[in-house]
């Protein structure tokens, strides 16, 4: 692919003339230089880990234990807290030292990776095939490529099992469903039934079903990681030991750019899935740390005013609202008792502060009259005023609310950022897949620049 651009910036002889790529095409110059490409990837990993460590320490330095995490714009500490570090009952932070340790470990790791990146970019061998055949490769070598795929799958499987080990043996993880408002606990009886675990994959993605995003107990999450880790490890071993079948050799494009496009597609799916997970799921992403989900904040508002008006003498079971439906309580299409008013659309919501008040047919009127605990009132009032709404200029909350606080939920940030990144990765997948297929078909030159329409247009002035 020729690129018409200024080729003056040359580094170590890899200029536009020798490689066919200009400086801004970045790693494209390194496609066939496995040693230099290794340097670029290790350096990139160093930058990622450096950001993680530095941002982690930045959040620790700014953290105020008296305020909830989601009010402080934190996106890393909630992940550490969810893993059970530094928190106690109700998600209260009792020790920030583990967070400090995490930041320092990432910074030290990033220094090692940074050194490796600089070494392999500037000093190490340009190609690895001659001196280190195990680490060397040729993009067309299908057997070597699936071996590398297998190694990556095994590493991902080990990662999944690290979470399992943390939950089972190393202090447990934070369970938002623990009685009394959440606590750290060890997961003892994992869900390993394939019908349950793979049942999530077969669910519809729409309301009431919610695909894998609907998972709402830690036993299923950790059990799912056992399955996923096992599949990744056995799949990895299989890919290392076998060569691609004939149908795969024919169907797939076997070039560096093709592998890039496959990876971008996978990351895009991860991004979209993570977006839905952090937006809707309050088990994997506990509301104590990330703030309530949208449906949760809405239901919390209905609950808060039900509590208030019931204290003022309203009969919440029979009060009629302005539309003729129940003001506080009504029935869902399938007959459950649900909160009335605008929040009826979120009747699916399950949340730890609300479930104790449900009976076999939805919300239980006698429990609503006699059993509401102070912690449920406090938590719903807190969630009501912290809906995951907000804008880029950090003016948060409901747009029409006159008593709004300046707050943007980390759920908003994490969901939006992962959606946007997932979208761009998908566009990158289309771009690189198109180029890789064109190159494989033999017409990767692109448009003939001599026939560019703009060359035949009269000047604007």
Swiss-Prot record:
Topology within the bilayer: Multi-pass membrane protein
InterPro entries documented for this protein: PS_antenna-like (IPR000932), PS_II_antenna-like_sf (IPR036001), PSII_PsbC (IPR005869), PSII_PsbC_sf (IPR044900)
Gene Ontology, cellular component aspect: chloroplast thylakoid membrane; photosystem II
Compartments where located: Plastid, Chloroplast thylakoid membrane
Transmembrane segments: 57-81, 122-143, 166-188, 243-263, 279-300, 435-459
Record text on cofactor binding: Binds multiple chlorophylls and provides some of the ligands for the Ca-4Mn-5O cluster of the oxygen-evolving complex. It may also provide a ligand for a Cl- that is required for oxygen evolution. PSII binds additional chlorophylls, carotenoids and specific lipids.
UniProt function note: One of the components of the core complex of photosystem II (PSII). It binds chlorophyll and helps catalyze the primary light-induced photochemical processes of PSII. PSII is a light-driven water:plastoquinone oxidoreductase, using light energy to abstract electrons from H(2)O, generating O(2) and a proton gradient subsequently used for ATP formation.
Name of the protein in its database record: Photosystem II CP43 reaction center protein
The organism of origin for this protein: Nandina domestica
Gene designation per UniProt: psbC
